Amino acid sequence: MQFSTTPTLEGQSIVEYCGVVTGEAILGANIFRDFFAGIRDIVGGRSGAYEKELRKAREIAFQELGEQAKALGADAVVGIDIDYETVGKDGSMLMVSVSGTAVKTRR
């Protein structure tokens, strides 16, 4: 499965648009509590543990996106948008969402 933020894939023609696909992953409140409790993990202004959790959530969202596209018979997803948003009544969770258009391509 190919993923692209652009509307086309270089060297390939889109032969069919299969539909919009999405993927989401939510990081619970524990990641924020752990993040602030482990603030000493920050090196050079960055937290390795927090970045690792965000990366994991993004990978889960992309996996869901790919599974939806595959179920539609697509071999690529184009026009991908990645969003990060706080959710929950007190904003204690972070949602990573990805969306794009599932397509069939030909070289």
From Swiss-Prot:
Positions in coiled-coil regions: none
Residues of the signal peptide: none
InterPro entries: UPF0145_dom_sf, UPF0145_YbjQ-like
Gene3D superfamilies associated with the record: Hypothetical protein apc22750. Chain B
Pfam family, one: YbjQ_1
Family: Belongs to the UPF0145 family.
Protein name as annotated: UPF0145 protein YbjQ
